[in-house]
A protein has these predicted regions:
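Phosphate-handling DNA/RNA-contact segment within nucleic-acid enzymes
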Residues: 1-70
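TOPRIM fold recognition
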Residues: 42-149
Length: 149
């Protein structure tokens, strides 16, 4: 088989219905990619189910407007795009749209390139607990049986 480095959306992709979570609060968090959305939630777990989240799978605002249409409770949008040139341009463009429509917004910028890199860095710096029991080769074989055909 061939490997491909293509990273993009399928032709049939409908950006207004991309990866998302509908909460009931007045807050919507918009991300570029699903992994960044999930990373952000994993770092901000408190009451996460209450809020709405969407991954545009690019720097489009279509999913944001669909989420606002589906949940009229949304009063504030948090733009959580990547900390790179495309994310900066996207945040500027979308914030101008929101400003023109009179919608409250805030721009949240990850420390590193994106929220997943921030999460990875936070995990790397977290203290790790060592195993408190030895694993012998015999017990490892019992834990991880190998299927031989």
């Amino acid at each position: 088989g061939q490997t491909s480095s293509y990273r993009g959306n399928a032709v049939s992709f409908m950006p207004e219905y991309s990866f998302h979570w509908h909460g009931q609060s007045e807050k919507l968090y918009l991300f570029e990619a699903p992994i960044d959305m999930l990373s952000f939630i994993s770092m901000h777990k408190e009451n996460w189910r209450d809020h709405s989240y969407a991954a545009a799978c690019c720097i489009s605002s279509r999913v944001m407007y669909q989420m606002m249409k589906d949940n009229p409770n949304i009063q504030k949008v948090y733009l959580c795009l990547d900390n790179d040139f495309a994310g900066e341009i996207g945040s500027k463009r979308i914030s101008e749209e929101l400003l023109q429509k009179g919608i409250d917004y805030e721009i949240l910028i990850p420390t590193r390139k994106d929220w997943n890199e921030d999460r990875q860095a936070a995990c790397a710096n977290a203290p790790h607990k060592s195993a408190e029991f030895p694993i012998s080769e015999e017990s490892e074989d019992q834990l991880c049986p190998v299927l031989q055909l």
